């Protein structure tokens, strides 16, 4: 089975390909271009380097978020299009769960992504990747308080961990290679979920909050859209 995984949750564009449970290609680019400019060429280039075509892919995997609103939309749209056009299954995976899976230690894992304004997307997972603290949008003060209440050594996973390390007295920063690229973890989790059924048309990004445009939308317009959604106009 050939699996293609995509992650556009952050500034890093990731495309990873596995064949028969072995990673054969892993392409990660942190650049100023938007994911819409870089992602499709990355997929095409990696397939070409491996001597493969898109028709050779049997299963697609997408990091569903949380993360960058724009990035998640782009990645999800491209992944769903590829799966639909080629008649293949798409498996959505939590970005935070994939980030936690970058570590295989017995310590509690605390994956975090920057949500700006002293806020983080975060969660806590045990050594078996069972969710201990629900992944959600938190202020760093609230999240660190919840983690510190556990009174255990934890691994801070994600590039934002270094910025907030002082908030976690028992927190350990992992080396750089643990903190961003999650393609291999997406493949690992997708293999575990490959027999589950996912409705392609019901797979959507997990933003964990409204977009800036939605938050700043005038109340009158919000009310009109809600009325329309409820069939009142």
Which positions does each model-derived feature cover?
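N-terminal beta-alpha supersecondary unit
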Residues: 1-64
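Short glycine-aspartate micro-motif
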Residues: 3-5, 61, 71, 109-112
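Short beta-strand scaffold segments in enzyme catalytic cores
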Residues: 13-18, 119-124, 206
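Surface "functional belts" at beta-alpha junctions
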Residues: 22, 89-181, 212, 233
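Residues at secondary-structure transition points
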Residues: 30-38, 69, 73, 77, ...
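DPxDG-like acidic metal-binding loop motif
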Residues: 59-90, 95
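Acyltransferase
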Residues: 175-233
């Amino acid at each position: 089975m050939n699996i293609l995984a995509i992650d556009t949750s952050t500034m890093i564009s990731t495309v990873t390909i596995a064949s028969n449970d072995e990673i054969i290609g892993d392409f990660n680019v942190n650049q100023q271009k938007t994911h819409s400019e870089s992602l499709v060429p990355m997929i095409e280039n990696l397939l070409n380097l491996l001597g493969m075509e898109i028709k050779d892919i049997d299963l697609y995997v997408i990091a569903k978020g949380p993360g960058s609103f724009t990035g998640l939309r782009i990645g999800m749209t491209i992944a769903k299009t590829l799966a639909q056009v080629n008649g293949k299954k798409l498996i959505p995976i939590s970005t935070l769960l994939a980030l936690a899976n970058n570590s295989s230690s017995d310590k509690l894992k605390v994956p975090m992504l920057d949500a700006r304004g002293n806020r983080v997307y975060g969660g806590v997972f045990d050594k078996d990747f069972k969710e201990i603290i629900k992944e959600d949008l938190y202020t760093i003060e609230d999240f660190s308080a919840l983690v510190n209440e556990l009174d255990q050594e934890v691994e801070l996973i994600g590039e934002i961990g270094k910025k907030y390390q002082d908030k976690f007295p028992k927190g350990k920063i992992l080396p750089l290679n643990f903190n961003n690229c999650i393609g291999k973890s997406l493949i690992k989790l997708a293999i575990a979920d490959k027999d589950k059924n996912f409705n392609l048309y019901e797979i959507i990004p997990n933003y964990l909050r409204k977009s800036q445009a939605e938050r700043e939308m005038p109340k009158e317009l919000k009310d009109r859209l809600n009325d329309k959604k409820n069939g009142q106009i």
